[in-house]
Every structure is written in C-alpha cells, then in structure tokens.
Swiss-Prot record:
Name this protein carries in UniProt: Acetylglutamate kinase
UniProt record, GO biological process: arginine biosynthetic process via ornithine; L-arginine biosynthetic process
UniProt record similarity statement: Belongs to the acetylglutamate kinase family. ArgB subfamily.
HAMAP family: ArgB
Coiled coil (residue ranges): none
Protein's organism: Chlorobaculum tepidum (strain ATCC 49652 / DSM 12025 / NBRC 103806 / TLS)
Length: 285
C-alpha cells in the first residue's frame, strides 16, 4: 500500500481534510482506536485534519440517566434548555475529550473545540423551531481559530454546538456543521465516516459519481430514501468550493486510509464532473 500511497501523500501535503466522524466507528473500541491511528497518520504526512463529530447515542444515554425524556421528530432531537445542557456536557465534554485522548495517545496532537469557542459556529434557529426547540442551523463559520490550530500542527476536534447573537445555544446536526466548515475552509476533501458503504446501485457501490449522473439516478428512483439528502448535500458542498466529498463505511478496517491513499478506495466519491482517467502517478482520490 505504501508505494500506491506515495503519489497521494505528495498530492495532499498541506491540504485540508474535514472529517465528519460518526456511526459504529465511534462506538466500537477497536474501530475507535483505528480511526485515531488513521487521523494521526494523515496529520503526520502533512495533511491538515479537522474533525467534526456526532454523539447522539451518548446524549440519549446521558439524558436517560438524568431522567429526561428524549423525543425525535423526523429524526431530529427535540431540544429544550435542559437538553442543551446535556448536549454541552456530553458532546463538548466526554465525547469530545474521548476522541482527543485517543488521537493524542497516538501522537496526533488533537485539541477539543466547541463551536462556541472563538465564535467558530454562529447559529440561527431552525425553520422548525416551534417543534424542535433549540435545534439550529449554521449561520456563519469563523475559521480563524481552526486555521490557527491547523497551522500549529494540531488537529481540531469540533463538537457541533453553536450560538446566536442573543446568546441562545443550539444543537446543530453534525453533518451540516461539517459541510459548512469544509466550505468555509475551502477544504480539499469532506469525508463522511458513517455506517453507509456509499451510493449503491444494484449490487455494487459506485466508486465515483458526478452531479449529472446523480440527478439522473434520483429521477429514475434508483437513489432513494435517506441517500437523497446525502447526495444533494454533497453537491451543495462541492458548489461551495470543496474539492471532493467522500462517503465511507467506518466499519471497514482502515477505511479512511484506503479511501484517501488507494486508487480503488472503499466508498463513493462525489465530483461535479467526471475526470479523465488518471495515471498511476497522478492518483484518483
């Protein structure tokens, strides 16, 4: 793999990758350690890595321990002020620091960041605020703190919490926060580490899909259900200036490195237009 990886290492040195970290890779102890090792390696070869993490299961468990009921509407957590306190305590606390500790154990120099720090994530109420409460959307991303950390060789690990100018704190969807941060940083890649293998058509996973083909597959009913918003979001992110968007299964051992440093990859990469087939020296990822 090392020989295959060398062109990619040269290609991506100094570039920024935003990684949205979620799914089973956040729960399984072996996968958690492998993710930390992979992230550390990316940083060691000169890639600027920014992590945005989820943590919904941990929030639900903490709420239950505190005797608080958890309610979801269309998959989104109804968030009152008590729930915001739990989210701050859990997401920006234990979940965030556990990730930081694992990366630092491998020499990765990670730093825990909340979206509240240095006005990193400014938020606004969701259009469904009357139903969802303090669930917010990203209004603005301030990159100065992230840039400072990355330029110092550190790995920002960001809990997706934001606040508005009135001081209201909001729970923000981690996928949305990661996309907004990637656009603000003009990242080379946005990589979603989840429990989804990629875009499946029949019995195969599409390695690369362009905007026109994705629109056609949606229109024909081949891409359906929960994959549609993922695909739409990917192309909105590309339109915002991000180089490529990747969707990979974090349950595959070393999926992050395999996606970035091999010709075949393991998931689906989203591009605006299909490129001419690269040479071995140029690489595909």
């Amino acid at each position: 793999m090392l020989v295959e990886a060398l062109p990619y290492i040269r290609k991506f040195e100094g570039k920024t990758f935003v990684i949205k970290y979620g799914g089973a890779a956040m729960k399984d102890e072996v996968l958690k350690n492998i993710f930390a090792e992979n992230v550390t390696l990316l940083r060691k070869v000169g890639i600027k890595v920014v992590i945005v993490h989820g943590g919904g299961d941990a929030i639900t468990k903490t709420s239950a321990k505190l005797g608080l009921e958890t309610t979801f509407v269309h998959g989104k957590r109804v968030t009152d002020r008590q729930t915001v306190d739990v989210i701050q305590m859990t997401l920006a606390g234990k979940v965030n620091q556990d990730i930081v500790q694992l990366i630092n154990k491998d020499g990765g120099n990670a730093v825990g960041v909340s979206g509240l720090d240095a006005d990193t994530i400014l938020a606004k109420p969701s259009p469904n605020a009357s139903t969802l409460g303090l669930v917010g959307e990203v209004a603005e991303i301030n990159t100065r703190y992230i840039d400072l950390l990355c330029d110092a060789g550190l790995i920002p690990v960001i809990a997706p919490i934001g606040y508005d100018m009135e001081g209201n704190i909001y729970n923000i969807n981690a996928d949305d926060a990661a996309a907004a941060i990637a656009v603000a940083l003009k990242a080379e890649k946005l990589i979603y580490v989840s429990d989804v293998e990629g875009v499946r058509v029949g019995n195969r996973i599409l390695k690369t899909i362009c905007k026109a083909d994705a629109a056609e597959l949606i229109e024909k009913g081949i891409i359906t259900g929960g994959m549609i918003p993922k695909v739409v979001s990917a192309y909105q992110t590309l339109d915002g200036g991000v180089g490529k968007v990747h969707l990979i299964d974090g349950q595959i051992t070393h999926s992050l490195l395999l996606e970035v440093f091999t010709n075949e990859g393991v998931g689906t990469q989203f591009v605006n237009e299909l490129e001419q087939e690269p040479t071995a020296e140029e690489g595909a990822s």
